[in-house]
Amino acid sequence: HCVTRRQRQMCIRDRYHTKMNAMDPMNMEMLLNAVDMAENEEWKGIVIGNDATNFCAGANLGLALFAANLAAWKDLDDFIGLGQDTYQTLKYSEVPIVAASTGLCLGGGAEVLMHCDVVQAHSESYIGLVEVGVGIIPAWGGCKEYLGRIKEFGLVPNGPMGAVMKAFEVIGTAQVAKSAQQARSMGFLGPNDRITMNRDRLLSDAKKTLIELSKEYSPPEPRTYSLPGFSGKAALELAVNDLALSGKVTPHDIVVTNALADILTGGDTDITAVSYTHL
């Protein structure tokens, strides 16, 4: 990592090298340590970025597969739990955090962006929650963040099912934005996120954004979600079953998408407001 002491900024970049900057426990510990240092040593904030071609291609699935092959389920649970704790720490940090994205920002990489206060995105940022494409679901807060963004950004009509159906479609089909501009229209980036056309200026622009953000910063308030519950879950599962009858999805696809439907609708409950921690 590097620091700019004159302006009291911290820039996290390339301390631990993984293939395509995949997220693993060492990277997560680095992020947690950075937030702790920034909060306790009065830094203005943190920029997360790198000089590589890709920001982050997702979680280190090789590590997860290795644990699964050994039936090391506790280690796998710990990996998932560490990710959830890390991303929530980014979201509610006492200092502002800016992500400087470029190239592939997939799965866990997209989740990093959605848990930062502002994204300074290179125009050639490819952003998406692609986990369903490899037979799993987003585990580090991507579902709740994307669901909340769709409604907050006014991308769907009001009502409990509009945002749920949109999130189910985008996440369930592993859609990827082909540019930062498209990512904004899809809800992966918001109206406060910024776009840099020149890759060479990305980190510089991110630092300037951080300085602006630090002047009057307060952490975001936790969201609550009004979800359709059992009836919404049944509707989504029915749609998936129709696809299964026509031979368009595999049996495992049904397992994965039903689990996704359970998360996005709040599970077997009536229409109710639930907290982000519940999701």
What are these regions (language model features)?
Residues C2-R8, I12, H278:
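Single conserved hydrophobic/aromatic residue that forms the stacking wall/gate
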Residues L76-F79, Q84, Q88-R223:
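Conserved catalytic cores of soluble enzyme domains
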Residues R5-Q9, L203, K233-A244:
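NAD(P)-dependent dehydrogenase/reductase Rossmann-like domain
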Residues R13-R15, M28-K74, Q84-A100, H122-Y126:
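A structural preference for short, pocket-lining loop segments at secondary-structure junctions
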Residues P228, G232-A235, K248:
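Conserved small-residue motifs centered on glycine
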